[in-house]
Amino acid sequence: MAKSIRKINLRKGKRRIPRGVTHIQASFNNTIITVTDVRGQVVSWSSAGACGFKGTKKSTPFAAQTAAENAIRILIDQGMKQAEVMISGPGPGRDTALRAIRRSGVVLSYVRDVTPIPHNGCRPPKKRRV
């Protein structure tokens, strides 16, 4: 006679994430928001392109705001209360994305600018002649 097989519940429950790290990567062409837990594992991400903005509209501050709201919305459902923010890049959406995160109700423990600054490294691209 065959033994009855115990069913194992493979579905994970909702992860509770009280603290997290929000990375804002603002380039001249797009803004990417990635939210990780304190160990560095990605919990949620969004970008202006993933929100439906195409071409030059991806580089607007409004697109960055929409991307930040989409990335944070998932985390509020998972119980995030406190976050650290790391901003990288010179793009136009960096301040607007930070403002959207502040308005979401998550308490920010600190905001750090981690933009890499060259000490006379690579030669910059040539100036545009339009």
Curated annotation (Swiss-Prot):
Compartment(s): Plastid, Chloroplast
InterPro entries: Ribosomal_uS11, Ribosomal_uS11_bac-type, Ribosomal_uS11_CS, Ribosomal_uS11_sf
Pfam families in the record: Ribosomal_S11
Keywords: Chloroplast, Plastid, Ribonucleoprotein, Ribosomal protein, RNA-binding, rRNA-binding
Main localization of the protein described in the UniProt heading: plastid
Keyword rRNA-binding applies: yes
Entries under PANTHER family matching the protein: 40S RIBOSOMAL PROTEIN S14/30S RIBOSOMAL PROTEIN S11 (PTHR11759)
Subunit record text: Part of the 30S ribosomal subunit.
NCBIfam families the UniProt entry points to: PRK05309.1, uS11_bact
Protein name: Small ribosomal subunit protein uS11c
Underlying gene: rps11
